[in-house]
Amino acid sequence: MVRAQRTKRASVTDIYKGCKASGTCPPDVLNKVEQNTLADKILKYGSVGVFFGGLGIGTGKGTGGATGYVPLRPGVRVGGTPTVVRPAVIPEIIGPTELIPVDSIAPIDPEAPSIVSLTDSGAAADLFPSEAETIAEVHPTPVDIGIDTPIVAGGRDAILEVVDTNPPTRFSVTRTQYDNPSFQIISESTPITGEASLADHVFVFEGSGGQHVGAVTEEIELDTYPSRYSFEIEEATPPRRTSTPIERISQEFRNLRRALYNRRLTEQVQVKNPLFLTTPSKLVRFQFDNPVFDEEVTQIFERDVAEVEEPPDRDFLDIDRLGRPLLTESTEGRIRLSRLGQRASIQTRSGTRVGSRVHFYTDLSTINTEEPIELELLGEHSGDASVIEEPLQSTVIDMNLDDVEAIQDTIDTADDYNSADLLLDNAIEEFNNSQLVFGTSDRSSSAYSIPRFESPRETIVYVQDIEGNQVIYPGPTERPTIIFPLPSAPAVVIHTLDKSFDYYLHPSLRKKRRKRKYL
């Protein structure tokens, strides 16, 4: 049994936050938070006229009084100068690095006069813009253009770089391709009659001749690659236990298994009802089907503990909470679906429900591995087409039935044939299960069913052969009825001699009398 956990009571501040907005706070909570109690009022009104500052009255430990405080001594320790942190790399100077002194190019003579006289330039400067004189110089085209020839001294050969006077023009070619995922061309096809959806058609004519273009080709042995429809059947491999193992997930699964399979704290119940896989709520209580509700979540069932309610399944008695499904692996290697439930068997006065934890589980059956079979290609694809022209399917013969020549036949027949004899159809038509309709299209018609008449079965007459063969006619056969003997004595022995008792008590059930010894 799981030990009940004690619920912590809410503090005064939490109660005040929840009830202040609705105005339902108790008076003691409201006065304590707003500092309006009797003690707060005494301190508030009493501090107006009375001052207790020098008496050392306080809630903490105080030395108190005029002689209790120690005066400050004159010696005060002065801290040292803080250390300046210097950068390890010398920063670069921002701005111009070279400083040019004033008049460093043309120094002033110290004996020169300090007053500089103005010099008249003669003509006044024209401050307005004017047209500038432009001289066009045309150079004649040289007749002979000299070519620079590099001269190499020594015993080496000269390498001349010849440059074309008219270099070729360079072009940039780009190509853009748009893929259409809804259109797919299959290069291989099977002879299936249908509509051709390819845009490329190749016509090969026989006897038209040919021409070989290019040099003599080299014969290369080609290999046969498998088509897109060929496949290989893989051999059956043992089923894999896990995919990518992760240490953290493995640790969480170990903790989960430790919580589910702890027999001291958790009750183990195996469920065989198939509703546990889809709708486990139907095993806890009787209810209607709700197609919108999702069963793959944690479900809480509110009920009164005082009321006795019998669940559909006895194993789910007093279930208050049923967890979400968990998929684990059993010891036999099968998939196990588990749900952790909580019973509410006892309810205290404070509203706390006490109950044990229950682990409901069911094991899924093993799926046997079937032998793989080779599948055949079915259906039509783009490119599988045989186009048939309609004029080639039928033949039209135009003739007059009245002008028919004489037909030669081996049997002696009449030489005169008319159109009615040629159109005569000797086929036997059947009108079984047909309807005969009387009336016109203007009014409602009446339908009459023609019954199907069948000829009776022919009577078979057996004639006895006199040449020695014997005909055996079927006849009724009577088998003797076997009567099994009944037991003469009944299986239960009933004593009817003694009529003083209405029941029979076995001697072993009678009380033994204690024998007393007489002195």
UniProtKB/Swiss-Prot annotation:
Molecular functions (GO terms): DNA binding; structural molecule activity
BP GO annotations: microtubule-dependent intracellular transport of viral material towards nucleus; symbiont entry into host cell; viral penetration into host nucleus
GO (cellular component) term, any one: viral capsid
Domain of life: Viruses
Subcellular location(s) per record: Virion; Host nucleus; Host early endosome; Host Golgi apparatus
Family matches, as InterPro entries: Late_L2
Short motif Nuclear localization signal, span: 1-10, 511-518
Bilayer-spanning residue ranges: none
Post-translational changes noted in the entry: Highly phosphorylated.
Keywords assigned: Capsid protein, Cytoplasmic inwards viral transport, Disulfide bond, DNA-binding, Host endosome, Host Golgi apparatus, Host nucleus, Host-virus interaction, Late protein, Microtubular inwards viral transport, Phosphoprotein, Viral penetration into host nucleus, Virion, Virus entry into host cell
Keyword Transferase annotated: no
Keyword Mitochondrion annotated: no
Disulphide linkage map: 19-25
Assembly and binders: Interacts with major capsid protein L1. Interacts with E2; this interaction inhibits E2 transcriptional activity but not the DNA replication function E2. Interacts with host GADD45GIP1. Interacts with host HSPA8; this interaction is required for L2 nuclear translocation. Interacts with host importins KPNB2 and KPNB3. Forms a complex with importin alpha2-beta1 heterodimers via interaction with the importin alpha2 adapter. Interacts with host DYNLT1; this interaction is essential for virus intracellular transport during entry.
Function noted in UniProt: Minor protein of the capsid that localizes along the inner surface of the virion, within the central cavities beneath the L1 pentamers. Plays a role in capsid stabilization through interaction with the major capsid protein L1. Once the virion enters the host cell, L2 escorts the genomic DNA into the nucleus by promoting escape from the endosomal compartments and traffic through the host Golgi network.
Protein family membership: Belongs to the papillomaviridae L2 protein family.
Name of this chain's protein: Minor capsid protein L2
